[in-house]
From Swiss-Prot:
Stretches assigned to the Cytoplasmic side: 1-12
Residues that span the membrane, as ranges: 13-38
Reactions catalysed, as given in the entry: N-acetyl-D-glucosamine + UDP-alpha-D-galactose = beta-D-galactosyl-(1->4)-N-acetyl-D-glucosamine + UDP + H(+); a beta-D-GlcNAc-(1->3)-beta-D-Gal-(1->4)-beta-D-Glc-(1<->1)-Cer(d18:1(4E)) + UDP-alpha-D-galactose = a neolactoside nLc4Cer(d18:1(4E)) + UDP + H(+); 3-O-{beta-D-galactosyl-(1->3)-[6-O-sulfo-N-acetyl-beta-D-glucosaminyl-(1->6)]-N-acetyl-alpha-D-galactosaminyl}-L-seryl-[protein] + UDP-alpha-D-galactose = 3-O-{beta-D-galactosyl-(1->3)-[beta-D-galactosyl-(1->4)-6-O-sulfo-N-acetyl-beta-D-glucosaminyl-(1->6)]-N-acetyl-alpha-D-galactosaminyl}-L-seryl-[protein] + UDP + H(+); 3-O-{beta-D-galactosyl-(1->3)-[6-O-sulfo-N-acetyl-beta-D-glucosaminyl-(1->6)]-N-acetyl-alpha-D-galactosaminyl}-L-threonyl-[protein] + UDP-alpha-D-galactose = 3-O-{beta-D-galactosyl-(1->3)-[beta-D-galactosyl-(1->4)-6-O-sulfo-N-acetyl-beta-D-glucosaminyl-(1->6)]-N-acetyl-alpha-D-galactosaminyl}-L-threonyl-[protein] + UDP + H(+)
EC number of this enzyme: 2.4.1.-, 2.4.1.275, 2.4.1.90
Organism encoding this protein: Rattus norvegicus (Rat)
Entry GO CC: extracellular region; Golgi apparatus; Golgi membrane
Pfam families reported for this sequence: Glyco_transf_7C (PF02709), Glyco_transf_7N (PF13733)
Residues binding Mn(2+): D196, H289
BP term (GO), one: carbohydrate metabolic process
Keywords assigned: Disulfide bond, Glycoprotein, Glycosyltransferase, Golgi apparatus, Lipid metabolism, Manganese, Membrane, Metal-binding, Secreted, Signal-anchor, Transferase, Transmembrane, Transmembrane helix
Subcellular location: Golgi apparatus membrane; Secreted
Glycan-bearing residues: N220, N335
Chief place where the protein resides: Golgi
Name of this protein: Beta-1,4-galactosyltransferase 4
Length: 344
């Protein structure tokens, strides 16, 4: 009388088995979902890491794993370094050698330096056009390396040497420097630097901003006054994007003069405004020299300036042809030697 009928017990048993089976399937599906989700996260992280390496041209790999981890842990350097001294009295020893300068800069290797105490805010390439100015180069390197180190910059110095006896082409050498330097590092900022100008005040920051910068407000040879109101020569700073936007310098200025004004016109054409440091900061010493043979005044410079607005798109980085003879990494700088087989 008190027992359940056999068919009722069988029904309840089947229901219990079905419920247990559903729970098992649900648990298995949920487990696989979370395992799959966990596996996706490392793949996403790996993708972002790979993208970062591509953006920075594999720079972390060149440091090695330990150094890369150490760099990642560093805090950013301040916008104004605490190591700056301000106005510096420059001394040029007549018998100074490159080996002496090298001994004073043991942390510079292959022309490269980065601060150990913090992560630099910008990677800066200094481009120096050069021919037959070995003594000037030694003097500039002697003062420029500690100058840049006090500013806590991640920097590299490139000397672009024009071989042969054809007329000197400063602008084209700087285009070459830009193109070749980018093969080694995705530089943020480029400093286009004459070899005979040495900065006196390290508050004159060798960094790039939202607008192109002209760093030579005055020099000893002009009584520390600007040469003329729209002067844009000597030492200038443009970001990678700014220089690319204006298609770099013209390649057609053979001999002395005009190429800086051409670059200024390109900058103005693109609605960019040139900034300068304060006069007591943007001070330089020009090392005296006579005009070099092969760097005579360019008699065509005014005509070329008048053509700028018509030719800037086709005359510049996009048309810079040269024969690369060598790239040598000396302790204090990278030396890029090129030959220009045509001249105006």
């Amino acid at each position: 009388m008190g027992c359940n009928p056999p068919y009722l017990l069988s029904y309840r048993l089947r229901l219990l088995l079905l419920f247990t089976l559903c729970l098992t399937v649900l648990g298995w599906a949920t487990s696989n979902y979370f395992v799959g989700a966990i596996q996706v996260i490392p793949r996403a992280k790996n993708f972002m890491a790979t993208l970062h390496k591509v953006m920075y041209l594999g720079n972390e790999e060149t440091l090695g794993h330990g150094a890369a981890m150490k760099k990642a842990e560093l805090a950013n350097c301040p916008s104004v370094s605490p190591n700056l001294r301000g106005q510096n009295k420059l001394v040029f020893k007549p018998d100074l050698t490159l080996e002496e300068v090298q001994a004073k800069n043991p942390k510079v290797s292959r022309g490269r330096y980065r601060p150990e105490e913090c992560k630099a805010l910008q990677r800066v390439a200094v481009l120096i056009p050069h021919r037959n100015r070995e003594k000037h180069l030694i003097y500039l390197l002697e003062h420029l390396h500690p100058f840049l180190q006090r500013q806590q910059l991640d920097y590299g110095i490139y000397v672009i040497h024009q071989t042969g006896s054809k007329k000197f082409n400063r602008a084209k050498l700087l285009n070459v420097g830009y193109l070749e330097a980018l093969k080694e590092e995705n530089w943020d900022c480029f400093i286009f630097h004459d070899v005979d100008l040495v900065p006196e005040n390290d508050f004159n920051l060798y960094t790039c901003g939202d607008q192109p910068k002209h760093l030579v407000v005055g020099r000893n040879s002009t009584g520390y006054r600007l040469r003329y109101s729209k002067y844009f020569g000597g030492v200038t700073a443009l970001s990678r994007e700014q220089f690319f936007k204006v298609n770099g310098f013209s390649n057609n200025y053979w001999g002395w003069g005009g190429e800086d004004d051409d670059l200024r016109l390109r900058v103005e054409l693109h609605k960019m405004k040139i900034s300068r440091p304060k006069p007591d900061v943007g001070k330089y010493t020009m090392i005296f020299h006579t005009r070099d043979k092969g760097n005579e005044v360019n008699g065509s410079r005014m005509k070329l300036l008048q053509q700028m607005s018509r030719v800037w798109k086709t005359d510049g980085l996009s048309s810079c042809s040269y024969r690369l003879l060598s790239v040598e990494h000396n302790p204090l700088y990278a030396n890029i030697t090129v030959d220009f087989w045509t001249a105006a």
